[in-house]
């Protein structure tokens, strides 16, 4: 998506005012992938999902990880990939699974996945890790594993990467090196060592595929000191040009709470490579709580709060010009492969169990379909800012908004490249997503907004609603909305032309 860099912190201080007739939908959230969202507006349709074949490009990536360790089964979920609408999928190539005998690569399992994905219109983002125990000190095969260190292991690694790129360079254009080198209490993978591994791997990829886009770093949580040391090595060796982006994974309970931390990471990277992008390379929320299932276990999650979290993360990243990858397509059986995670990881968009079967799509699958259907490269981000004064003069093209609450809202705006019609994303961003559809009616005024026929869209359910003439008006450069239901899941106020719909 063609966008402009802007970090938006949205805090206004006008009195809280729940308007008469505010929606208080206290229905329990539906499980089983269905939404019970209801408001007082007239529903006129639903967001029409789009297949990846119908989308040229977008900001999104989808996690299809752990296939190299048989924690999930691609055959079980492959039919769900195209209809989701996210073109790029993250895969791990699995050195240890592919080279079980020295010098012999069995590509059959990976060929099957990559060939099928490409045939479906998907674009693999392929990671070269993990290590391989058939060589001395060649690293481990799981999350938190040490990287290869011995000369023999590094030579074998080089051969592996070269063989991998030669085989898939006509089908894979995006690559990644090593997953979460700083995970947990890992002290083996120093930033300097991992920087050197990233450089040697990227040089092999670029030699064989000069047009390749390579993601570096891929750290498991934002550690600014680790990142600084990593970037410094690459910069001092003059190798930053090898990398398209630096990836990070930062799991936080409130998906809107870490924008400041990402901005700090951006400032560190800017010291060394201001043109290298950041990519949020892995994130997602569980669909129920409990420790031992990976990150974010200490919360009573539901399918509804998972759907809110994932879509807030996606749209929050989009609003800050950060590419976003969501983990993952299906629940993963981590316990089967000696991972530090000992239970089923339930961050999947599809429910699974210990047999790795695909049982059904969760609510988050459908909610992310709605995001993918609307937000593609036909839109560009607008630098929208809050204002207290709706009568203040604006520069040409400047867009501002006002809200009748001192509660914090996330508000981002986008404009169609050709028609210049606009869509605004809005949600309450103060807290961890809850398990309720309860909304609060709010008044919103947009200055210089370009919307002729406004509709209200609930991203979670996909419902598209008419905003009646009694609830909106144009007054000069002001577009004024009254009694708009807002909650902690994303809603849109959009020009109707930007929302592909289907009948109920």
Regions found by a protein language model. Name each.
Residues 1-23:
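Bacterial Sec-dependent N-terminal signal peptides
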Residues 389-450, 492:
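Carbohydrate-binding surface patches
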Residues 465-504:
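C-terminal beta-strand-rich structural cap/linker in extracellular carbohydrate-active enzymes
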Residues 21-88, 100, 115-123, 203-206:
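N-terminal carbohydrate-binding accessory modules
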Residues 81-244, 250-253:
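Substrate-binding cleft and catalytic face of glycoside hydrolase catalytic domains
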Residues 444-465:
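Solvent-exposed beta-hairpin/edge-strand motifs
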Residues 288-400:
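Aromatic/acidic polysaccharide-binding cleft in carbohydrate-active enzymes
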Residues 191-324, 336:
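Noncatalytic carbohydrate-binding groove/subsite architecture in carbohydrate-active enzymes
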């Amino acid at each position: 998506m063609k966008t402009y860099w802007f970090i938006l912190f949205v805090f206004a201080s006008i009195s809280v005012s729940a308007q008469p007739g505010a929606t208080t939908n206290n229905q329990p959230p539906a499980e089983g992938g269905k939404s019970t969202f209801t408001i007082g507006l007239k529903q006129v349709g639903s967001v029409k999902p789009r297949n990846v074949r119908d989308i040229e490009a977008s900001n999104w990536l989808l996690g299809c990880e752990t296939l190299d360790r048989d924690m999930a089964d691609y055959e079980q979920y492959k039919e769900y990939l195209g209809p989701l609408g996210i073109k790029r999928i993250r895969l791990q190539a699995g050195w240890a699974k592919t080279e079980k005998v020295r010098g012999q690569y069995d590509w059959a399992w990976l060929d099957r996945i990559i060939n099928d994905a490409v045939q479906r219109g998907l674009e693999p983002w392929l990671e070269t890790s993990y290590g391989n125990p058939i060589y001395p000190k060649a690293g481990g095969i799981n999350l938190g594993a040490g990287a290869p260190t011995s000369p023999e292991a590094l030579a074998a690694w080089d051969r592996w990467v070269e063989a991998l790129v030669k085989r898939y360079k006509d089908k894979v254009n995006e690559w990644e090196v090593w997953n979460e080198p700083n995970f947990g209490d890992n002290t083996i993978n120093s930033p300097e060592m991992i920087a050197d591994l990233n450089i040697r791997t990227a040089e092999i990829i670029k030699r064989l595929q000069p047009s390749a886009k390579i993601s570096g770093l891929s750290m498991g949580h934002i550690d600014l000191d680790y990142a600084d040391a990593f970037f410094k090595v690459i910069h001092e060796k003059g190798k930053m040009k090898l990398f398209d982006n630096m990836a990070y994974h930062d799991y936080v309970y409130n998906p809107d709470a870490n924008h400041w931390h990402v901005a700090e990471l951006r400032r560190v990277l800017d010291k060394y490579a201001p043109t290298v992008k950041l990519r949020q390379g892995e994130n997602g929320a569980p669909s129920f709580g409990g420790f031992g299932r990976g990150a974010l276990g200490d919360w009573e999650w539901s399918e509804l709060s998972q759907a809110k979290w994932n879509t807030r993360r996606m749209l929050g990243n989009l609003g800050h010009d950060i590419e976003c990858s969501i983990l993952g397509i299906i629940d993963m059986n981590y316990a089967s492969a000696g991972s530090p995670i000992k239970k089923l990881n339930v961050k999947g968009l599809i429910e699974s169990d210990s047999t790795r079967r695909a049982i059904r799509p969760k609510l988050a699958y459908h909610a992310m379909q709605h995001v993918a259907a609307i937000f593609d490269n036909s839109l560009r981000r607008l630098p929208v800012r809050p204002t207290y004064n709706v009568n203040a003069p604006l520069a040409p093209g400047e867009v501002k908004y006002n809200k009748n609450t001192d509660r914090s809202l996330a508000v981002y705006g986008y404009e169609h490249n050709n028609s210049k019609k606009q869509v605004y994303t809005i949600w309450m961003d103060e807290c961890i997503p809850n398990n309720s559809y309860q909304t609060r009616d709010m008044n919103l005024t947009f200055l210089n907004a370009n919307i002729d026929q406004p509709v209200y869209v609930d991203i979670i359910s996909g419902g598209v609603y008419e905003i009646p003439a009694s609830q909106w008006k144009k007054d000069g450069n002001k577009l004024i909305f009254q009694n708009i239901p807002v909650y902690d899941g994303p809603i849109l106020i959009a020009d109707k032309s930007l929302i592909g719909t289907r009948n109920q």
